[in-house]
Amino acid sequence: MTYQYPGTIFFNRGIAGVITMTQGPVSTETGCPAWMVVSARLRLSGEMQGMPLEFRMENTSLEEEGAGFISRTRLLEACCRHFLVWLHKWEEEGFRPVHDMWSNRAEKHVDLRVADGRTAEWLGLDEGGAGLLKLDGDAVAVTLADSAQLFAVPDLQDSPESGEAE
């Protein structure tokens, strides 16, 4: 499993899900946000075999990757446990361990499509978790709040024609 800023989830380089987050103000005392809301959409299954090759190469599901036996409840429980572990680590040790873990799983050498059609080059995360991008020739830090306005959320299509998310 790998990630692409700001929130695309890949299984074996196929798009499988999307995470969106929003947060409250960051405490100057702890460096942690006062609150955070996380939304996740994950393609659990789908009839990929009948789809065009290009679609199958770009998309996948838990079922396609051999994990279709995992129930929605167990998946949600596992995600919540992992999220709380990393949130606790952030509170106790600062953002650095979270930064390192995320960076190790991030897709490398990626060009990101901005909602207005421009392309941004992915450079990495800064110490506060903002995405560092090269946009219009300039290096910029894009906060979590700004990323929601800058990037369109990927559509988890069931088929090339549907546009419907599972």
Q: What is each residue range found by the language model?
A:
Residues 1-15:
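Conserved kinase catalytic-core segment
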